UniProtKB/Swiss-Prot annotation:
Transmembrane segments: none annotated. Secreted subtilisin-like serine protease with keratinolytic activity that contributes to pathogenicity. Belongs to the peptidase S8 family. This is Subtilisin-like protease 11. One of its GO terms (cellular component) is extracellular region. Keywords: Glycoprotein, Hydrolase, Protease, Secreted, Serine protease, Signal, Virulence, Zymogen. The active site is at 159 (charge relay system), 191 (charge relay system), 346 (charge relay system). It comes from Trichophyton verrucosum (strain HKI 0517). GO terms for biological process: proteolysis.
Amino acid sequence: MGLFKVIFTAVAALSAVDAAELLSSAKSKDIIPNSYLVVMKDSVSSAELDSHVSWVTDLHREGVAKRGAENLGGFKHSYKINGWHAYSGSFDSETLASILDNDKVDFVEHDRHVYISGFVTQKDAPSWGLGRVSHRMNGTRDYVYDESAGSGITFYGVDTGIDIHHPDFGGRAVWGINVVNDTKDNDRHGHGTHTAATAAGTKYGLAKKANVVAVKALNDYGAGLWSNIMKALEWCVNDAREKKILGKAVLNLSISGGKVVAANQAITNAAKAGIFVSVAAGNDNQDATNKSPASAENVCCAAATTIRDDKAKFSNYGSVVKLYAPGQGITSATPNNQTGVMSGTSMAAPHVGGVGATLMASKGIAPAAVCAELIKMASGPVLNPGANTTNKLLYNRSGK
């Protein structure tokens, strides 16, 4: 009997050690109660994920019957991105405990809110970003660029939606998907249209011939859930694969929130699938190391400069920043055939995405190599870039 107790205790201890971890989060205000992102181990196959999801669905159903957890929706969505597997759902504590104890699960994380990284400053002010990224020296508004202008490249704007009928897109924009419940297939906020036109507008954009796909993952107030962002990423990868444009696609994330490991992994795997991903550093004037998507691997993280080539006072900084780009007082298209001026690292990121698209079109550079090439091409120095931060400024190597 004593031997049995010893063995039982050892097995129980081993089970506890092997249990998946529920990652803690420093900022509780962004957490969605009882909503989780569940990431599977690398060895788990697509079929095994499907089987696991069936088990979780049954487990949740039993929990509702026993404990009356009707207010929790259970399983929501599974993610399959370039061999990476995860799912989201709302579960009670007992169901969560069973999930954590499942040997297929790597870790679990709270789903959290995420927000745009830009804000409106004024309407119809003069633009300067295009001229700045096409000249080594400051002081000119002429935009000089390779004639390919992103031709053959597709830009996915994962944002508040895009006004695809805006004349600045010249008929090159199409609607992709809306993953936000209770919203229409349009851009009532303006942020998504502005960032997409900064990257690929005919007048206001850098990659003037690129195709544009609207992917609505944020609501009409510029806020969203990481679980929806991940769903949008999965759709983009699948869409690019179906259209055979992996290797010729750019995806922009002008959003920021607290660091979410599951989201970072989803973004990284989207990049590894064959998409150049430009992201915003965030607007908190702090180190972006603890921010997502800025801290994700295999992305090109952009911080924001002013017209004077200094760090914008709101811009985040830190070692994860790959480049600075224009981000204060940027004029671009807004819904209903309008234009407007916005500021933020949200505006810096599509500058990087747009120049990246032109580089891919003109030089045939693979998405995985684009950020390193942009760093090599960069000008500067940016003034007062922040601690442990590059002083390199985005430049398209126009020769000017």
